[in-house]
């Protein structure tokens, strides 16, 4: 009987949280709030968890399904970027990526050292630039505090998204007068079936191949393989409602596990978190100078290329400002590098600790 009441209570809470999240998501999207759907889900599910004093669990199979679509979405920039375009920028981009990763890892370790409540895995994942929607999933897989990682990542995303239009407006650039549109991709029904199958089995393939962060890299690998075998004109982008569901799922996992104790802990660590976010943004801005010199591009392009996240805002400003392919190439290389490294963070931390001792 108690089990029935508990399940009935959970169904009622979800019947309020799910439509409430969708409504707030549309409102945030209309207001152009960064990461609108994820933040909407965090707000609504977090309010439910805080008001009832109980976590709001999400069905494990449904969450695994959503994680598969995160991997699919992460792979799409690789399919839309030509290999020749990437190869020209690969070495400078890798150099910039190494510096960016070093800042993120160093900042995360310092944050963990300064705030004993934060583990080293949590600190590093909260400071890695790029893939804000992916980091909470990786944090959950790696046993880090995914609530803190999510809140920190979206604090960074918000700071970058708000500052980018204001800062890049100060840099000289040539606005694009004539928009160049790529050939429209078609999406037959069987392409959608392939995407759904990849989302369902991708994490199992990743585990079978023993990939780090298998729930993300497994679907990514399958999407890239399928994309190489099938003509470019076919789109593997999930439909908009599926994207909304995927982003909402990330927010529900974070917000549904919030508590007053967790929020108080995050608030207590907020000054340190903000400081390291500012250092990360400033460090990435500094790496734009050598990139500008080596590739002979404008600082406007280099700054967008090295921006620590907010990819959609970066690409919109890049298109509006007439930036070259260096922006897309560098951002894609950095995201792939971050994903490849993130799964090895526990082993990397153990290696650093061994050398230190």
Where are these regions (language model features)?
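Cytoplasmic-side transmembrane-helix entry/capping segments in multi-pass membrane proteins
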Residues: 59-71, 90-95, 117-128, 150-155, ...
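Intrinsically disordered, low-complexity non-transmembrane regions of multi-pass membrane transporters
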Residues: 1-19, 120, 145-148, 173-189, ...
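Membrane-embedded alpha-helical segments of transport systems
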Residues: 99-100, 129-135, 150-169, 283, ...
């Amino acid at each position: 009987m108690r089990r029935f009441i508990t399940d009935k209570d959970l169904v009622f809470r979800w019947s309020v949280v799910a439509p409430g999240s969708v409504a707030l998501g549309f409102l945030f999207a209309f207001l152009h709030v960064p990461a609108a759907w994820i933040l909407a889900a965090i707000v609504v599910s977090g309010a439910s968890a805080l008001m009832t004093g109980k976590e709001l669990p999400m069905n494990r199979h449904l969450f695994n399904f959503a994680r598969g679509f995160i991997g699919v979405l992460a792979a799409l920039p690789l399919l839309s970027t030509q290999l020749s375009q990437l190869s020209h920028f690969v070495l400078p981009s890798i150099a910039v990526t190494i510096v960016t990763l070093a800042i993120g890892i160093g900042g995360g370790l310092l944050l963990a050292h300064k705030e004993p409540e934060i583990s080293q895995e949590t600190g590093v994942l909260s400071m890695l630039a790029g893939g804000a929607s992916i980091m909470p999933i990786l944090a959950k897989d790696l046993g880090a505090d995914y609530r803190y990682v999510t809140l920190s990542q979206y604090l960074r995303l918000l700071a970058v998204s708000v500052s980018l239009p204001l800062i890049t407006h100060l840099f000289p650039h040539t606005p694009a007068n004539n928009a160049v549109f790529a050939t429209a991709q078609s999406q037959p029904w069987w392409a959608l079936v392939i995407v759904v199958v990849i989302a369902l089995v991708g994490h199992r393939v990743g585990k079978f191949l023993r990939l780090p962060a298998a729930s993300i890299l497994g679907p990514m690998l399958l999407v890239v393989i399928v994309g190489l075998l099938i003509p470019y004109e076919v789109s593997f982008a999930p439909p908009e409602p599926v994207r909304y569901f995927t982003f909402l799922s990330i927010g529900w996992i974070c917000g549904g596990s919030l508590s007053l104790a967790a929020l108080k802990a995050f608030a207590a660590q907020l000054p340190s978190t903000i400081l390291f976010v500012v250092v990360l943004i400033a460090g990435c801005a500094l790496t734009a100078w050598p990139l500008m010199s080596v590739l002979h591009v404008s600082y406007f392009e280099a700054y967008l290329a090295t921006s620590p996240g907010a990819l959609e805002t970066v690409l919109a400003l890049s298109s509006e400002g007439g930036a070259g392919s260096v922006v897309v190439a560098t951002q894609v290389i950095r995201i792939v590098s971050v994903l490849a490294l993130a799964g090895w963070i526990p082993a990397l931390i153990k290696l650093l600790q061994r050398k230190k001792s």
